[in-house]
Amino acid sequence: KTYDFWNEKCIIEFKKRTCNHDTFPDFILQKDKYDMNMELAKKHKISFYYQNKFANGKIWEWDITDMVERNDLPRLINKEMNRYTYVDNPNKIVKQVYMLRLDQGYEI
């Protein structure tokens, strides 16, 4: 399962961050999650949203479907990252990711 929430209107991928919303200039959306969720959204004619909840209580949302329609998705980059997010394992791999800026989304 690549999403956290699903209803008749949308798919939501939800991340809980240990930083504040303004700690970093951008936030990671992995290409594999993008690909699978956009495929589901298109198949069911619903929207795909990416949400981040930050340590300071703010929740930010990016309307990925709308960003794609407006050709506003950032370019895809390769980034060396932990193989698994919440596993104590120092092994790194290269992942393809989109780096989403706060100004491409909105607070909800």
Residue spans of the language-model regions?
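Beta-rich catalytic cores
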Residues: 1
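Short, conserved, surface-exposed binding loops centered on an aromatic residue
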Residues: 4-6, 40-42
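Conserved catalytic cores of phosphodiester-cleaving nucleases, focusing on short active-site segments
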Residues: 5-21
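A generic structural signal for alpha->beta connector loops
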Residues: 8, 45-47
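Structural beta-sheet core signal
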Residues: 11, 50-52
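General helical secondary-structure elements
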Residues: 11-13, 29, 79, 97
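Mg2+/Mn2+-dependent nuclease catalytic core
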Residues: 17-41
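Non-catalytic C-terminal interaction segments of nucleic acid-processing enzymes
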Residues: 38, 46, 53-108
